[in-house]
Amino acid sequence: MDRRFLFALFLFAAVATAVTDDTNNDDFIIRQVVDNEEDHLLNAEHHFTSFKSKFSKSYATKEEHDYRFGVFKSNLIKAKLHQNRDPTAEHGITKFSDLTASEFRRQFLGLKKRLRLPAHAQKAPILPTTNLPEDFDWREKGAVTPVKDQGSCGSCWAFSTTGALEGAHYLATGKLVSLSEQQLVDCDHVCDPEQAGSCDSGCNGGLMNNAFEYLLESGGVVQEKDYAYTGRDGSCKFDKSKVVASVSNFSVVTLDEDQIAANLVKNGPLAVAINAAWMQTYMSGVSCPYVCAKSRLDHGVLLVGFGKGAYAPIRLKEKPYWIIKNSWGQNWGEQGYYKICRGRNVCGVDSMVSTVAAAQSNH
């Protein structure tokens, strides 16, 4: 094989891997492959001024301001690289553009790793897939609450959990009720005794299946209005007499996209995990990055639907996609939602999927 081709292939792989590397060397790697005179940096100061105004950003000192401006410029470079590697989506300036990669992970992700399933978890039964619709969206059927905002607290797992149970409760009762994430943040400390670091721990991360286990053991969850979200860890104030939704059972869906779609249609929105490496710069469109590690799951989200395709002129084809409800507020992505390619487990979106059934309730 031609040596020049091998070298070019190696260089592409190295650069692509650097884009999604979770180490703290992201910015250093980026500087190696991007010309310092990139035209999109010529107006960086103007972009930063607009960014501060749009997202109400302020900094206590000039030193902090100047530091954040430097981070912002690095993230402009990162967004351009993401655009090149994920051309079917739009990447650019977001509410997270003044955060380093490590700050973003620490403050806005929070999914923990787990090798074993909780005691009450079971494998979801195999469902028929022959009559699946081409498009499906639980938002159109009234089973999804408005997009919420976890703030700078690693509680994504709690929002994924409540979102799935909100949908299941709607299917069981016909009532859409916003459930309390703060109850999970404060009260859920379910652990796997055989795996170190697997405990749900509020703003320091957790797992959706752990949370379903907690809800089974505790008797359920109260409404959001009865236990409001604060975005920080607190003492448990759970009042069982105010429970409005409870878990009957929960299951883990096999790594098969047709089965995931079938479970979504039959059982309601699904709690899923994802590698969020491309989400810091995501603005809109169908995200289908060339490289995104499937095993590096670090963010809990809610799968609410799917579409048969959005035209991608760069790739000359329709790209079928999943519709993901995120918990970063409505001023991120597509009014708080994320579209990601279906078909090949992009960013591990098919790797950790759970469905929950709600108990019938008289509330």
From Swiss-Prot:
SMART domains associated with the record: Inhibitor_I29, Pept_C1
Q: Which SUPFAM superfamilies match?
A: Cysteine proteinases
- Some GO term, biological process aspect, for this entry: which one? proteolysis
Cysteines paired by S-S bonds: 153-203, 187-236, 292-347
Q: What is its EC number?
A: 3.4.22.-
Q: Which residues form the propeptide?
A: 19-131
In this protein, the residues bearing a glycan are 249
Q: Which interval of the chain is the signal sequence?
A: 1-18
Q: What class of enzyme is it?
A: hydrolase
Which keywords does the record carry?
Disulfide bond, Glycoprotein, Hydrolase, Protease, Signal, Stress response, Thiol protease, Zymogen
Name the Pfam families for this protein.
Inhibitor_I29, Peptidase_C1
A GO MF term: cysteine-type peptidase activity
List of catalytic residues: 156, 299, 326
**What does the record note about the induction of this protein?**
By dehydration of shoots but not roots and not by heat shock or ABA.
Q: Which family does it belong to?
A: Belongs to the peptidase C1 family.
Query: What name does UniProt use for this protein?
Result: Cysteine proteinase 15A
UniProt organism field: Pisum sativum
